[in-house]
């Protein structure tokens, strides 16, 4: 599974998802990067890479991936919420609020009431 042409397999089937979760952080980052080289528009993989960077404390890399995700998929509401959390952890509260406001707009567009509620709650906490 270390070849890029097989990277897509990690997203197929629960068994492979479990294997992915057992991989080291470095291996997960590598796998996601390889997959995105072949599938740059894949929202799930882009989100996954952003989340891996965020969990690793690599804030700028995470935010770069969230930005790419939201440029390609402006209605991917989880991207706004998790980007806002990443910004807030980095002490960038004003940017986190703006991200949440944009996410709330996306949630309204898509009718995603759960995401709307989560982001509105976080925005209230930050205000």
Predicted regions and their residues:
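Canonical positions in the second alpha-helix
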Residues: 34-35, 68-69, 103
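Structural marker of alpha-solenoid helical repeat scaffolds
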Residues: 38, 72, 89, 106-110
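Residue at a conserved register position within TPR or TPR-like alpha-solenoid repeats
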Residues: 53, 87, 120-123, 127
């Amino acid at each position: 599974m270390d070849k890029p042409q097989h990277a897509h397999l990690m997203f197929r089937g629960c068994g492979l998802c479990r294997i992915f979760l057992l991989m080291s952080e470095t291996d997960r980052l590598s796998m996601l990067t390889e997959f995105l080289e072949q599938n740059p528009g894949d929202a799930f993989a882009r989100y996954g890479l952003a989340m891996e960077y965020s969990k690793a404390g690599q804030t700028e890399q995470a935010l770069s991936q969230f930005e790419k995700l939201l440029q390609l998929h402006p209605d991917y509401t989880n991207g706004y919420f998790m980007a806002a959390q990443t910004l807030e952890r980095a002490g960038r509260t004003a940017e986190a609020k703006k991200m949440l406001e944009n996410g709330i707009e996306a949630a309204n567009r898509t009718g995603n009431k759960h995401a709307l509620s989560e982001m509105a709650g976080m925005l209230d906490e930050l205000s």
